[in-house]
């Protein structure tokens, strides 16, 4: 089996580096970008196994990426991360097709890793 490929779109350099290190140590191949436009460019080059998108980024936000890749037309899960615990944002993200939505201040890297692992297992089962 190939190494799972994760796309991380996060404009905060410190957080982006933390995610890259933790996921790399856990055996994932990582592509990291700083905004939604770069995320779309990377998705067009090579579809990720999972995309993790910050909600609020310059140039293009996570919602715009979700709108570009609705759940019915993509074969990879998308997780949205946000600094804000606004229920409306979470509802909009899920409505647009996010597979999960985490508030950064309420989440740990371990929780995010567990969610990614769960989504990868589900994806592999569907592909069999």
Q: Would you name each region that the model predicts?
A:
Residues 46-52:
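Active-site beta3 strand of CheY-like receiver
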Residues 13-31:
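Two-component/phosphorelay signaling modules centered on CheY-like receiver
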Residues 33-37:
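Conserved Asp/Asn-Gly motif in the active-site loop of CheY-like receiver
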Residues 10:
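Conserved acidic carboxylate
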Residues 57:
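Receiver (REC) domain active-site loop signature in two-component systems and cognate sites
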Residues 54, 82:
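Active-site residues of response regulator receiver
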């Amino acid at each position: 089996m190939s190494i799972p490929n994760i796309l991380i779109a996060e404009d905060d350099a410190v957080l982006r580096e933390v995610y890259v290190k933790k996921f790399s140590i856990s055996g994932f191949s990582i592509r990291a970008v700083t905004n939604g436009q770069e995320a779309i460019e990377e998705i067009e080059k090579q579809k990720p196994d999972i995309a993790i998108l910050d909600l609020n980024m310059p140039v293009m936000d996570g919602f715009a990426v979700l709108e570009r890749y609705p759940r019915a037309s993509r074969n990879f899960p998308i997780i949205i991360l946000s600094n804000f615990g606004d229920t409306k944002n979470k509802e909009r993200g899920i409505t647009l097709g996010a597979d999960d939505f985490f508030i950064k201040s309420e989440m740990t890297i371990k929780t995010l890793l567990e969610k990614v692992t769960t989504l990868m297992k589900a994806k592999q089962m569907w592909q069999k």
